[in-house]
Amino acid sequence: ALEAEVKAANGQRAEGSCFPYPIAYNLIPQIGGFNEMGYSSEEMKMQNEGRKMLHDETIRFACTCVRVPIIRSHSEAITLEFENDITPDKARELLAEAPGVVLCDDPNNGQYPMPLLTSDQDLVYVGRVRRDLSADAASFNRSLTLFCCADQVRKGAATNAVQIAELIFGLK
């Protein structure tokens, strides 16, 4: 749909679109239908699956899922509150050592995660690690904000399935 709309924006005829509005050069803050509280089905899925993956039903999530005009990769701006104090530098150190993660965090020199970097890879790119300025005084030293990107087909589905199978069957 995006490729067809880019052609249309360049004066060529576009085929039918699966989106309710033009997606080329646009953002659509809706993925799926809305519930009575105003959350889309994708937002509810993200909240429910996040708790399930982390094995903690008490974790609170707030998210807005937005359809963006790119072909591959998902991106997330994430704010985290930890039980103990953590500095952005310590978080960067831990992320740099994490398997499957690429720390891409030098914003002053234009180095940060972007979908174009992550497409067709099994890696999660993380950057823009910084203090959460919305945190209150009690949690300020325990709160960070970061940005990450990953290919949702490779890392979000296929690679995760292979990695889980490797763990279950002791293949790695």
Residue ranges: model-predicted function:
Residues 1-94:
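Active-site-lining helix/loop region of Rossmann-like oxidoreductase modules
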Residues 57-172:
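C-terminal active-site/capping subdomain that shapes the small-molecule cofactor and substrate pocket
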